Amino acid sequence: SNFSRENSLAMYHQSFKDMQVEYFDYYLLHAIGGGGMKVFNERYIDNGMLDFLLKEREAGRIRHLGWSFHGDVEVFDQVLAMHDTVKWDFVQIQLNYVDWRHATGNNVNAEYLYGELAKRNIAAVIMEPLLGGRLSNVPEHIVGRLKQRRPEDSVASWAFRFAGSPELVLT
């Protein structure tokens, strides 16, 4: 991709036209973590875009500035460490009752991610509360245990309730 300042500014300004708005309530830097800090720096630092977006927030055209995390926990930690100067308003993380402590593959335990956000009082936006739908279709022995406690509740409602329960989750 071309991360030039010109392309990035054009995309930003086109978003206002496409959405037919004068400001964004939440402006998210998407897919931070893939490609390491090299890609983050190319997309937002080297071309001055992060500084530009911070000025846009000051001007009121962005009300809340944040990013979505996908991948490398070292990048998560480094971008989060920028909070002292950037003052991130929110971060989107994968959070569900399986990934809380038992994340697999490229995922990172949500307990760690959320804990780091909480230390800095940064709001969390949740993705994958149903883990791609898998938490709405669990084995029957688990369904039975859930229904013993709350017979009227759907299996999916347990996952949504878990994901929406932490104090700093935006709901």
Residue ranges and their predicted role:
Residues 1-9, 30-33:
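Structural motif corresponding to the early beta-alpha repeats
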Residues 5, 16-19, 151, 155:
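Short linear sequence motifs
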Residues 5-10, 38-42:
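Short, conserved acidic/polar surface loops in the N-terminal third of protein domains
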Residues 8-27, 54-59:
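CE4/NodB-like, metal-dependent polysaccharide N-deacetylase domain
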Residues 31-171:
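Beta/alpha (TIM)-barrel catalytic core signal, keyed to glycine-rich beta->alpha loops juxtaposed to Asp/Glu
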